[in-house]
Regions:
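N-terminal organellar transit peptides
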Residues: 1-109, 113-119, 124-139, 143-243
Length: 243
């Protein structure tokens, strides 16, 4: 066995070792080079590092990945899978705005749940899906740590809430009045304000486009890629524009 074969064998063994460590199996089928996969899981980490036992999505990982996707001519579409409890507002909105500004077709799929700042992350794609049993919690913004009891604090909270609400309304079919009503609900969550939406409810209220799974989402992404190849402009619903 020559040096080149040894290097290839070592690289293959290292890859198998990493797969076993990360996924619990030695064989992981590779994703199509045409479609980039982004997973947003656990808690969206902000400027403070979360404890090591907390599953998290780091914006400093997502942003370079999104830039790489945008500049890579081989990638034709982006598939985003979400199962997140929410997290940092600034980091979540930064990732959501990056997803929204990508020129390539994007489709999101909510599995398990996409709560709090996970809501705009789900609606940021051109077209969104939610699995039948998945949930989405809409609630007002909240803060940990020191809070100063002054009118300016309320104004700051209000402005932050407006940023989130405006993004959701801009990227979904939900009316702003409906969104505000769901956020201020007091009889649904224990010791909290807000509303929990399950599968079809999110679609009925215009937050998510369709109930479906992986095959539905990938089929939709393929159709958007084909429309893009035909130079058809897509509107905010991921549908063909009449113009």
């Amino acid at each position: 066995m020559d040096e080149k074969e040894k290097e290839l064998q070592l690289a293959e063994e290292k890859k198998i070792e990493e797969n076993v460590k990360e996924y619990g199996t030695d064989k992981i089928p590779s994703m199509s080079d045409r479609i980039a996969l982004i997973t947003i899981i656990g808690q969206v980490e902000g400027h403070n590092v979360l404890p090591p036992q907390t599953k998290s999505t780091k914006y400093e990982h997502c942003i370079p990945q999104l830039v790489s996707i945008e500049t890579n001519d081989k990638i034709e579409g982006v598939f985003i899978i979400l199962n997140t409890v929410g997290g940092d507002v600034e980091a979540g909105l930064a990732i959501a705005e990056m997803i929204r500004s990508i020129s390539k077709p994007t489709v999101s799929l909510v599995i398990g749940g996409s709560h709090s700042i996970g809501v705009p992350l789900a609606t940021a794609a051109n077209y969104s899906f939610i699995s039948p049993s998945a949930t989405m919690i809409i609630h007002p913004v909240r803060m940990n740590g020191l809070v100063i009891g002054a009118p300016q604090t309320f104004e700051y909270f209000n402005k932050m809430q407006e940023r989130i609400s405006d993004f959701i309304v801009r990227t979904s079919k939900m009316e702003k009045d409906t969104l505000k009503r769901l956020m201020m609900q007091t009889d649904e969550l224990l010791n909290d304000m807000g509303t929990i939406l399950i599968g079809e409810q999110a679609v009925e209220l215009g937050l998510i486009d369709e109930v479906g799974g992986i095959s539905d989402a990938l089929n939709k992404l393929e159709s958007l890629i084909n429309l893009k190849a035909e130079n058809v402009n897509l509107n905010d619903d991921g549908k063909e524009d009449d113009k």
